[in-house]
């Protein structure tokens, strides 16, 4: 037996032993963690080598909450390119037909995009807003019905305006609304300290006290009729409604970069942007329907394996019907890393102690960094992203916890504490 063969066998034995020791170490670490005492699944993988450091129930399904936005992010970048398809238009004789694409930035105070208004205001032709032939569901399947008054539950529409939110504020002891159109929809006052909308229609009651009120964003009930009225109110000219599918000859106008949508979606977990990214994908590919139909198309058109197994219902993760596996998010994150590179992902994803939903998280070691997307419901906390240890080594991970009978903040601390063992 040659010395070279013996040395080879010894190297394999040493590596096998080291791997076995690593698995034993992580198994013991996990068993000591509160994560072992609740419904949880996780994968930790070395970014550069692809080696699995530790996994537990990685092939089981969990509610992803806002981690679903990572799937939306990947699909948007794969199907949309770099720019936002803002609206579509077609001129015929004395008529200008226009279609919404789902662009969430039109007249949105956070973006100040007036491209559609500027375009329509220059025209002397009859303005016709072409609404979809089939209504797009304004709320996602499996959304909590009593969130309707909260800004994170803005409705979904083919041509969103003002972020599909009414802004209420007090100036010189007078109530103000943005857009001004909704000033006439204020019906009275109540004893609560917040603005309350009727569940089914655009009627708002206001708090009796104005002195301590600051600003509140409330979703409004969307419709094709209201879209036309809001445009007409801004343009000061009539807007006619027709229900027509987008004409193949219609030209899509591009305004702004998609990065301007990705950052608030990922940093602030903006649900409205996430939902409308799916509509943007549909509009660019001339797919009709809402989230369900577009996701069904993505499952057929995409080469990503995770789509075939996952129960993916909406773009934002608000739905309790979504079901993903930790291993799905490893695949998503790996694909994002391949497409963007680590430097760009460090900008786009929230960072512990610095940006977005992870800004308030203080890690035990100043040398540790996490760039990740969090997601939470009552009894649910998920975190998927990248962890850098004190040696500069980067891991890709997904930790999903469901059905915990304690606060979300406690689950968050359990997840972070477990990750910080990666040194």
Please give the residue ranges for each predicted region.
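Small-residue-rich helix-loop
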Residues: 53-55, 278-423
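Mid-domain, small-residue-enriched loop/turn segments at the edges of structured enzyme/sensor domains
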Residues: 92-169, 178, 185, 191-194, ...
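Short, well-structured active-site flanking segments
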Residues: 79-94, 342-346
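Beta-lactamase-like hydrolase cores
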Residues: 21-61, 80-83, 119-124
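Coil residues (strongly favoring Ser/Thr
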Residues: 49, 83, 94-95, 234, ...
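A small/polar active-site loop signature that marks catalytic segments
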Residues: 188-348
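Bacterial Sec-dependent N-terminal signal peptides
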Residues: 1-29
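Active-site SXXK
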Residues: 50, 64-81, 159, 230-231, ...
């Amino acid at each position: 037996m040659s010395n070279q063969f013996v040395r080879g066998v010894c190297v394999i034995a040493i590596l096998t032993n080291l791997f076995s020791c690593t698995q034993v170490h992580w198994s013991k670490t996990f068993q000591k963690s509160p994560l072992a005492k609740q419904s949880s699944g996780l994968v930790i993988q070395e970014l550069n080598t692809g080696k699995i450091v530790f996994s537990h129930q990685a092939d089981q399904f969990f509610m992803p909450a806002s981690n679903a936005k990572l799937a939306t992010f990947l699909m948007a970048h794969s199907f949309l390119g770099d720019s936002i398809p803002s609206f579509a238009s077609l001129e015929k004789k004395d008529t200008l037909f226009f279609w919404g694409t789902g662009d969430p930035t039109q007249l949105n105070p956070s973006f100040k995009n007036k491209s559609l208004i500027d375009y329509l205001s220059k025209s002397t032709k009859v303005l016709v807003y072409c609404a979809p032939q089939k209504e797009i569901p304004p709320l996602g399947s499996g959304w909590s019905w009593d969130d309707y008054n909260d800004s994170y539950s803005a409705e979904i529409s083919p041509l969103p305006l003002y972020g599909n939110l009414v802004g209420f504020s007090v100036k010189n002891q007078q109530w103000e609304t943005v857009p001004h159109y909704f000033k006439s929809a204020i019906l009275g006052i109540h004893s609560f300290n917040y603005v309350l909308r009727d569940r089914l229609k655009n009627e708002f009651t206001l708090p009796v006290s104005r002195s301590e009120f600051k600003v509140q964003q409330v979703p409004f009930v969307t419709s094709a009729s209201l879209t036309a009225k809001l445009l007409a109110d801004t343009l000061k000219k009539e807007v006619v409604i027709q229900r027509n599918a987008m004409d193949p000859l219609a030209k899509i106008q591009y305004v702004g970069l998609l990065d301007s949508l990705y950052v608030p979606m990922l940093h602030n977990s903006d649900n409205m942007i996430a939902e409308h990214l799916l509509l943007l994908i549909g509009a660019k590919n001339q797919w009709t329907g809402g989230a369900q139909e577009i996701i069904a198309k993505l499952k057929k058109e995409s080469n990503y394996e995770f789509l075939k197994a996952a129960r993916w219902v909406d773009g934002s993760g608000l739905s309790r019907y979504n079901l993903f596996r930790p291993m799905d998010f490893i695949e998503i994150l790996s694909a994002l890393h391949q497409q963007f590179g680590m430097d760009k992902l460090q900008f786009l994803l929230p960072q512990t102690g610095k940006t977005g939903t992870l800004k308030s998280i203080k890690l035990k070691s100043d040398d540790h960094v996490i760039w990740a997307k969090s997601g939470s419901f009552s009894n649910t906390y998920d975190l998927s992203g990248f962890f850098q240890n004190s040696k500069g080594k980067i891991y890709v991970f997904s930790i999903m916890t469901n059905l915990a009978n304690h606060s979300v903040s406690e689950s968050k601390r359990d997840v972070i504490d477990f990750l910080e063992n990666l040194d």
